[in-house]
Design a protein with these regions (language model features):
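Ribosome large-subunit tunnel/peptidyl-transferase-proximal elements
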Residues: 1-236
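Intrinsically disordered, compositionally biased charged tails
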Residues: 1-3, 223-277
Length: 277
C-alpha cells in the first residue's frame, strides 16, 4: 500500500493542533512542540499511526466488512460522504441518531418506514389519497431521508467506525465502545486518544487535513476490497479448471469402461462360438 509522506502531511496542515490551554494530557506523546500558543503535532507519529490504521482498514476491506464513516462538522460533511461512497460504505454527516448502534433494531424500523413510504409513492393508487396526506408523507419521507438516507443499506451493525472529531462525535464513540466495535479516528490535541482503537493524531478542523488522511485510509480499504475480489475470481477460476480436469478424467474412465465392456463382449462371443463348434 502506498503511504503518505511527511511533506504531504505538512502541506495539508495536519500538524496544527489546538490552543495549548485546550489540550488533553493523553495527547502528550504525539505533540512535537508549542508555537505561538498552539500545539504542533509530531507528523512522524502521525505517519506511524496512519500506517497502523491503513493496515487494519485494508484487512477489513479484504474481509468484505462494513465501516461506518461519521463526521457532522461543516468542513467534514462532504469529504466524509464522498469518501464513504467511493467504497460503498454507510456514513453519517447529519446529526448522529442516538442509539444508531446501541438500539439498531429500532433504527432499522425507521429505515423500513421510509422504504414503505417509497413503496406507497410508487403505487398507482397513491394519487387516490388526499393532497394533504400526500404532503404529510412527503415531508415525513424527507425527514427520514435526511437522517437515515446514507445508511439505508446498512442491514447490520458495522464492523468498525471511522470518526472525524471525537469530541463532537462523542456519542458515536461511546456507542461503539459499548458494543466493542473498533473505532478509527482523526484525533486532535484537545481529545483523548486512549479511548480510540486506531487514533490518527492530526488536525481535525482543516478540510485539507481531513481529506488527506481520509483519502489515504479509504484507498487502503479499497485495495483490500479489490484484492478480495481478485482472490475470489482466482478461486473461481481454479474451481472451473479443477471441474474441467475432473470432467476429462470422468470421460476417460467412461471410455475405458466402454472399451473394457466391448472387449469383454467380444471374448464372450468367441467363447459361445467355440461351444457351438
Amino acid at each position: 500500500m502506498e503511504q503518505l509522506t511527511f511533506d504531504q502531511l505538512l502541506e495539508a496542515g495536519c500538524h496544527f493542533g489546538h490552543l495549548t490551554r485546550k489540550w488533553h494530557p493523553n495527547m502528550a506523546p504525539y505533540i512535537f512542540m508549542e508555537k505561538n500558543g498552539i500545539h504542533i503535532i509530531d507528523l512522524n507519529k502521525t505517519l506511524a499511526k496512519l500506517e497502523e490504521a491503513n493496515q487494519a482498514g485494508y484487512n477489513l476491506g479484504r474481509a468484505g466488512k462494513k465501516i461506518l464513516f461519521v463526521g457532522t462538522k461543516k468542513q467534514a460533511k462532504e469529504i466524509i460522504g464522498n469518501a464513504a461512497k467511493s467504497v460503498n460504505m454507510p456514513y453519517i454527516t447529519e446529526r448522529w441518531p442516538g442509539g444508531l448502534l446501541t438500539n439498531f433494531v429500532t433504527i432499522r424500523k425507521s429505515i423500513k418506514k421510509m422504504q414503505q413510504i417509497d413503496k406507497m409513492m410508487n403505487d398507482p393508487t397513491f394519487s387516490n389519497i388526499s393532497k394533504r396526506e400526500r404532503l404529510q408523507l412527503a415531508r415525513q419521507r424527507a425527514k427520514l431521508e435526511k437522517t437515515f438516507g446514507s445508511i439505508v443499506n446498512m442491514v447490520r451493525l458495522p464492523s468498525a467506525i471511522f470518526v472525524v472529531d471525537i469530541v463532537k462525535e462523542h456519542i458515536a464513540v461511546a456507542e461503539a465502545r459499548k458494543l466493542n466495535i473498533p473505532v478509527f479516528a482523526i484525533v486532535d490535541t484537545n481529545a483523548n486518544p486512549q479511548i480510540i482503537d486506531y487514533p490518527i493524531p492530526a488536525n481535525d478542523d482543516a478540510a485539507k487535513s481531513i481529506q488527506t488522511i481520509l483519502e489515504s485510509f479509504v484507498e487502503s480499504v479499497k485495495k483490500g476490497y479489490n484484492d478480495r475480489i481478485g482472490a475470489m475470481e482466482e478461486a473461481e477460476k481454479e474451481d472451473e479448471e479443477f471441474s474441467e480436469e475432473k470432467l476429462k478424467e470422468k470421460k476417460i474412465k467412461v471410455m475405458e469402461a466402454s472399451v473394457d465392456a466391448e472387449e469383454e463382449g467380444k471374448g464372450n462371443k468367441q467363447r459361445r462360438t467355440r461351444k457351438k463348434e
